[in-house]
Amino acid sequence: MTGTGSPDEYTLAELKAMRLRNGAGIKTRHQIPTFEEVMNLCKGKIMVNVDKGYDYFKDAYEVLKKTGTVDQCIMKASLPYEQVKAENGEVLDKMIFMPVVQLHKESAEATIDGYLEHMKPQAFELVFNNDSPEVQRLIKKVRDSGAKIFINSLWPELCGGHDDDRAVELHQPDESWGWIIDQGAKLIQTDRPALLLQYLKEKKLHE
C-alpha cells in the first residue's frame, strides 16, 4: 500500500508497510528507509548530503556515530554561524557542516565572514538568482578562502540561470556547467549526472 498525509501521523511500523511511488505516481517495491539504514548502506562508499536535516542535527549525529559514518555526511543550513553554534554547541565541531549562503541577499557577505572567522568550513553551498558582478565577487571571495564551492544546477534560480535544462535542452553546456566550473565549483548538484559526467570527460576534467 501507499499512504497520504504527514509521516508523523504514522508509526514506523505503519510507514514500513507502505511502498514508495515513482516519478509517475506508480507504486514501487521500495520501502521508506530510516536514516540509519541509509547510512549503513552508504558506509565506506559515498558522501551523503543531508538536505533537510538541520532540525534533527543532534539526532543525526548520534546515528552517524552509531554507524561509523560521521566523516561521510554533510549537514547544512541557511543560517548565520552564531545561530548554528548556539543551537548545536560542540556537536557542530564534530560534523562536516556546510553553510548555505544566498549571495543575492544583503546579509550574504556578513554570513560568509562569520563562518570564515569562526570555523573555516570545508565547503559553502552558494545560491544565487543572478550572476551579477557582486555575486561573482562573493563567489571569488569564498574560492580565495580555500573552501570548496558547491553549486546546485537543478533550476535557474539556484545558479543564476546556469542550470541543467540550459545545458541539455538549450544545448548550452558551456554556459551552464562550464560556467559553474569556471567559478571554481568542485561540487555540483544535478539531475543529469550521466550527461554532466560525459561533459567533464569531454573537457578532460574527469578520468
Placement of each model-derived feature along the sequence:
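Metal-dependent phosphodiesterase/phospholipase catalytic core, i.e.
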Residues: 1-103, 126-129, 143-145
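C-terminal active-site rim and adjoining tail of enzyme catalytic domains
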Residues: 25-29, 106-207
